[in-house]
Structures are given as C-alpha cells and as structure tokens.
Amino acid sequence: MKHFSLLIAFFSLLFSSCAEQQIANAPPSTYELKQNYPNPFTDSTAVEYGAPYVEPNSAAPWIRVVVFDRFNQKQAILVDNGAHPAGRFKVTWYANGVNGFTVAPGVYYIELQQINLSGPSLGEDVFTLLRIAALKQ
C-alpha cells in the first residue's frame, strides 16, 4: 500500500502544475506582464507578472496567467489565484501542456487575465498578451 501511495504522489507531481510561483519584490502601480526569458526557449521559460496594491476595503482581483497555442487552444494554466496578493511574481513554465505532456515546438501566447471581484469595475477583465516561441527539445 505504501508503494501505491508513493506512485500516486509521483504521478500527481508529474501531471500537476507546470509552473512554480516565487515572490520577487515590491508591487507595481498597475498590472503588468513582462516578456518571458529566455525567448525562444527549449525546456523552460520564466515569466514575471505583477499585481498592484488594492485598498483594504476592496476585494483583491482574481489573476490568471494562461498559455495558448496559435489556434487559441489553452495549453497551460500557470496561475489561477483568487484574492491574489499584491506584488511581483515569477512563474516558470516547463513547457508542459494541460495534459502533462511536453508541448510541440512553435509559437505560443501568454495572457495575464485580471478579473475584478468588487467595486465599480466589478467583473471587468484586463488582458495583457505576450508572444513566445518554443524550440525543439
């Protein structure tokens, strides 16, 4: 039974998130998505994004960072965080798709989606889009 649990843990790690998130430093004044590096990339690429400080009486926004292919098919969800804290963050994408397998070489797009959960701009989305390139591994 112990080996079965270890096997499940291994496959959960293998097929779970294809990104990791690290806090970088002080929050920006507006939402931002910086160009990935390296670009083009082979096995992984890092993307930095930022969320500004939100007033204490306001709900923090929902933030998503999503990778799409050239056919607008979702390939990876790097961040999907409700009540996202303010700050600058770095996400590393290991070129894995939503199915857990490595994506094909080609052009991809990283999109920052910000959904307001309260206030006068309730439900409004803010989108920022970057073009990236994956090379053959």
What is each residue range found by the language model?
Residues 60-65:
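Exposed beta-strand and adjacent loop surfaces of beta-rich binding modules
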Residues 68-75, 108:
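Short, glycine-anchored, charge-dense loop/turn motifs used at functional sites
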Residues 11, 53-59, 98-100, 116-122:
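Alpha-helix termini
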Residues 18-24, 32, 37, 47, ...:
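C-terminal tail/sorting-segment detector
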